[in-house]
Amino acid sequence: MRYIFHISLLFLFSTLYSSRCIENIEVNLWGQCYSINETFKLNVSGSGLTGSIPLEIGQLTNLYSIDLSNNRLSGEIPAEIGNLHKLDFLYLQDNELSGEIPVEIGNLKDLDRLFLSSNQLSGSIPKSIKNLQDLKYLYLFKNNLSGTIPSEIGELINLFKLDLSSNFFSGEIPLTIGNLVNLNSLRLFNNNLDGDIPLAIYNLNKIEFLFLHNNDFENINKIDLEKIPSLINVKITD
């Protein structure tokens, strides 16, 4: 019994010590200490994390990659994420995150990949998204996002893959979608989009995958897919 007691005390003291970070030099995230200046990559994917994303994550300003995917994180994406100006990759998919996408996401001007899919995010896409001029992958599918698709999305001219499927977006596809001339894949299916599919999609001469089904478009039969010869896989009707 005494041996077990000593082991328990050792475990308690080691746990307390490991979670005691050096003030102004380290931050505590999920019981681990991370150097403020020397943490460049944070990968805790599939670690069974719960609760909210700590606000302190915004202090790790040298991060270029965050992967918190495949956990059970809840609550809102903290606005402090916008402090991470060097971030190239942000993977938050497959969690239970809710609330709106923070406008501060537009501060991440070096971002290459933004994966927020398979969460419970609501509200609209912030117009500050237009600041992400280097963005190549934008995955927002399987959320509760609503409102119209902002015309500002057409300013992301380096986008390679855009997936907004399985949300509650309404209104028309913005004409500016035709500006995305580097787009390889466009997935907008399972939404409440209506009106006409803009003929500007004919400008997407590199697109190979186009999925627009399960919406309420009015001019589906007038779309001439032969004008987009790059297409490999397409579905625009239910």
Per-segment meaning from a language model:
Residues 43-48, 74-77, 125, 139-142:
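Short, conserved structural micro-motifs that define repeat-unit consensus positions
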Residues 40-44, 64-68, 88-92, 111-116, ...:
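Conserved hydrophobic beta-strand positions in leucine-rich repeat
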Residues 53-55, 74-79, 101-103, 125-127, ...:
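The feature encodes a structural signal of leucine-rich repeats
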Residues 2-56, 227, 232-238:
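N-terminal capping/linker segments that flank leucine-rich repeat
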Residues 36, 59-63, 82-87, 106-111, ...:
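Leucine-rich repeat
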Residues 21, 194-238:
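Leucine-rich solenoid repeat scaffolds
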